[in-house]
Amino acid sequence: VEVGERRLEIGDCAGPKSAENVLLHPDVESAVFEAGRGGILREGLGFDRCDVAIVTNIGEADHLGQSDIQTPEQMFMVKRSAVDVVLPGGAKVLKADDPIVADMAPLGRGEAILFAIDPAHPLIAQRRAENGRAVFVEDGVITVAEGGWDTPVVPVAEVPLTHGGRAPFQIEN
């Protein structure tokens, strides 16, 4: 964890303690955190409100059987924690390809923004028909649809995490 040029922590910093350390730093105005299942179950989120919550996966059975989480429905209850603290005027960004995640759309406050690779995904198509916001990949470019307009943002291959567009699971998330 770094703030400006100063390193605060080294190692696995995805838990609530790291979030608290960052938020308490006097130079921090905004931050992005990973709120994983383990940290949420052990100590909570590490923050009590947020402007944006992003939920990428539940239905793939990742981490089931750990920490007494046996079913996707139980994991839903853990992962919705971030959605529950979105402020009014904020947003919850949800993976349309995971039906359990997409089911979080009506929960809490803030706008639900759905994302998927396929612009023809039924939930993306519905969101676009309603003039709501959706994010998808079209012709190799990450695109945001809102209010009947499609705005190309960046070619997938230019996003470092996708390794030139060759890491499909990173593109999906």
Q: Can you annotate each of these PLM segments?
A:
Residues 1-4:
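Short beta-strand-centered segment that lines the nucleotide-binding/catalytic pocket of NTP-utilizing
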Residues 6-47:
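Conserved nucleotide-sensing/catalytic segment adjacent to the nucleotide-binding pocket
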Residues 51-173:
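Acidic, Mg2+-coordinating active-site environments of NTP-dependent enzymes
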